[in-house]
Amino acid sequence: MDTIFAEATPPGRGGVSVVRLSGPKAHATLESLAGPVATPRMAALRALRDGDDLIDRALVIWFAEGHSFTGEEVAELHLHGAPVIASRLSQALLARGLRRAEAGEFTKRAFLNGRIDLAEAEGLADLLSAETEAQRKLAMRATEGELGRKADELRSKLIRAGALIEASIDFADEEVPDEVPEEALDLIKAVRSDIQGMLASYPATERLRQGYEVAIIGPPNAGKSTLLNRIGQREIALVSEIAGTTRDILELHTDLRGLPVTFLDTAGLRESSDPVEAMGVARAVQRAAEADLRIHLSVDGVPEETLVLGDIIVRSKADLGRGEETAISGLTGEGVAELLDLVYDRLRVRAADSGLVGHKRQAEALQRAVAALAIDDSLAPEFLAEALRQAAQALAMMVGRVGAEDYLDEIFSSFCIGK
């Protein structure tokens, strides 16, 4: 196994730069640069030298094999944050036979060495890309191994049910028993119900992980772009009295009280002889249909498009008068805070339905498991036992206990180099 290294901190100038090593030569390499560092898991200030060249004075620490994140020998060198120092250290490490780590290779080694399961690795990737508090909390549940523990619990029940069925076959007076033990059937029903519940929460979990989209739709000159600018508190969209100014969909990524929300400013909905504007309108209609929530904005408060349950109808340009409760003014800000309250309340309800399964790969594994368990209770015991084995294997694959090879490159390539 190669010993690898990479900067664990972002490249560029900063207060501190951390270089991480992992592999069988990590400790020996550290001592070749810093002198004896005998005590693991204890930081020490050392001069780093490559021959007669003093590279830097750094805080160093190492972890013994089996007691590190990767499961291998690991060393960390906390340097001063000038890029030239990390570059000079890299030269010294390459000269000692180490190689630069690939993206996500430290985490991949942690998985291969049994330090984390695949769901925890996916959770770590989500944590590193989290932009809001809700996403952070969701990712932390995954990194703490909740999904892996749930999968193991369900597998244990299936294994118990399978053992009861196998025992009924092995010790039956007849060649093949006619009935499946009642305890086994109860366990199968309980597992099937749990998996169906996990699958039911997948869409909400996936949306929270990816972020919600809220489309602002309505006729031309309804104030959609002005509203987007007001929400973003900066000029994002060009505002003009000329109808049809907005043609492309403009996006505003926001943290709405911990929820990841992207507001979409769309082209004004109308029939147009201008082919470019017509394309913009068509895209607006499609994107609005795909959005999680729609704000129907118009001067008269009458929506242009068919309503979907949960949509919000708002009369714009409240600064012009008429003082209705559902009116807003993107120009003055009147009613915008109340509108954002309403958007948050709508999305918060959906976020509350989130669970443990937030990745397509995980959901597909659960679908295979529940399909294997979609069996008639009157099925012959030997066939039922085989169905249980298939379901248990699908659960094991969900967290990478078996058959994870096809997913490794895709999952770990999303990490940064030093993770």
Curated annotation (Swiss-Prot):
Chain residues that bind Mg(2+): S225, T246
Stored SUPFAM superfamilies: P-loop containing nucleoside triphosphate hydrolases, TrmE connector domain
GO terms of molecular function: GTP binding; GTPase activity; metal ion binding
Bound cofactor: record note: Binds 1 potassium ion per subunit.
GO cellular component terms, A-Z: cytoplasm
Ranges where the TrmE-type G domain occurs: 211-348
Binding residue positions for (6S)-5-formyl-5,6,7,8-tetrahydrofolate: R20, E76, R115, K419
Keyword annotations from UniProtKB, A to Z: Cytoplasm, GTP-binding, Hydrolase, Magnesium, Metal-binding, Nucleotide-binding, Potassium, tRNA processing
Enzyme Commission (EC) number: 3.6.-.-
Protein localization: Cytoplasm
Cofactor(s) essential for the protein: K(+)
Annotated positions binding K(+): N221, S240, I242, T245
Entry's Gene Ontology BP terms: tRNA methylation; tRNA wobble uridine modification
Primary localization class, coarse: cytoplasm
Chain residues that bind GTP: 221-226, 240-246, 265-268
InterPro entries reported for this sequence: G_TrmE (IPR031168), GTP-bd (IPR006073), GTP-bd_TrmE_N (IPR018948), GTPase_MnmE (IPR004520), MnmE_dom2 (IPR027368), MnmE_helical (IPR025867), P-loop_NTPase (IPR027417), Small_GTP-bd (IPR005225)
Subunit relationships: Homodimer. Heterotetramer of two MnmE and two MnmG subunits.
Function: Exhibits a very high intrinsic GTPase hydrolysis rate. Involved in the addition of a carboxymethylaminomethyl (cmnm) group at the wobble position (U34) of certain tRNAs, forming tRNA-cmnm(5)s(2)U34.
Family as reported in the entry's similarity comment: Belongs to the TRAFAC class TrmE-Era-EngA-EngB-Septin-like GTPase superfamily. TrmE GTPase family.
NCBIfam families (UniProt xref): mnmE_trmE_thdF, PRK05291.1-3, small_GTP
Protein name: tRNA modification GTPase MnmE
Species whose genome carries this gene: Paracoccus denitrificans (strain Pd 1222)
Lineage: Bacteria, Pseudomonadati, Pseudomonadota, Alphaproteobacteria, Rhodobacterales
